[in-house]
């Protein structure tokens, strides 16, 4: 959540800013497992979010979500816990600029605000699975915060990996989906391009990290 701040201390992330987005899920509290696998929609390629989908946890619990609502500060998990006035002003600034100047972001923000409604979120989920149990059997679960990088020059959401560094430090500013699936080749890329080149001043042979 603070990768850009740390990078700025080293002279990087000059063109980027991190804007937090809150992801909230609805968790199914019923006893029957009405689905057994994760189910995803076709993503909207204009945005770096997967949309409302079904997740089956390792314990069998079913979740619907997440939302992608702008958070008010970087650790805005619940209420006013970890409130940060400076971050609030920064977040309002960038969200307002994108809302005014970028019609696609404006549509995204309006759509995501509607997902504060449990019934609306479930209606979105019904596009994937029609026979969903009653909304009364779903409860809001703990939220997560997505560290979304934006380009300050173009006011766009960055949808690719962003790495900056030199011989003194390496900064992963944006690690997007599929970050977990791509973790090994991505780690190889970072080691070969930054660590091996700048720290050890030698080439890494193909197939070695």
Language model features with spans:
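Mid-domain beta-loop-alpha active-site segment that forms a flexible
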Residues: 1-3, 121, 186
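Residue-level recognition of phosphate/Mg2+-coordinating polar/acidic sites
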Residues: 59-73, 79-130
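Flavin (FAD/FMN) cofactor-binding core of flavoprotein oxidoreductases
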Residues: 15-23, 27-31, 99-177
């Amino acid at each position: 959540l603070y990768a850009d701040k740390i990078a700025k201390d080293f002279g990087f992330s000059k063109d980027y800013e991190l804007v937090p987005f809150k992801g909230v899920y609805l968790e199914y509290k019923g006893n029957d497992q009405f689905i057994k696998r994760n189910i995803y929609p076709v993503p909207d390629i204009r945005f770096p979010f997967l949309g409302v989908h079904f997740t089956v946890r390792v314990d069998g619990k079913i979740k619907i979500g997440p939302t992608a609502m702008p958070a008010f500060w970087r650790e805005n998990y619940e209420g006013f816990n970890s409130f940060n006035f400076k971050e609030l002003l920064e977040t309002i600034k960038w969200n307002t600029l994108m809302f005014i100047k970028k019609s696609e972001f404006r549509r995204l923000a309006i759509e995501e605000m509607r997902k504060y409604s449990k019934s609306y979120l479930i209606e979105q989920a019904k596009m994937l699975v029609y026979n969903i149990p009653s909304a009364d059997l779903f409860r809001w679960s703990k939220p997560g915060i997505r560290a979304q990088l934006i380009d300050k020059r173009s006011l766009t959401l960055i949808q690719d990996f962003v790495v900056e560094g030199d011989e003194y430090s390496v900064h992963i500013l944006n690690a997007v989906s599929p970050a977990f699936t791509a973790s090994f080749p991505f780690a190889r890329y970072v080691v070969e391009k930054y660590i091996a080149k700048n720290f050890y001043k030698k080439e890494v042979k193909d197939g070695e990290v």
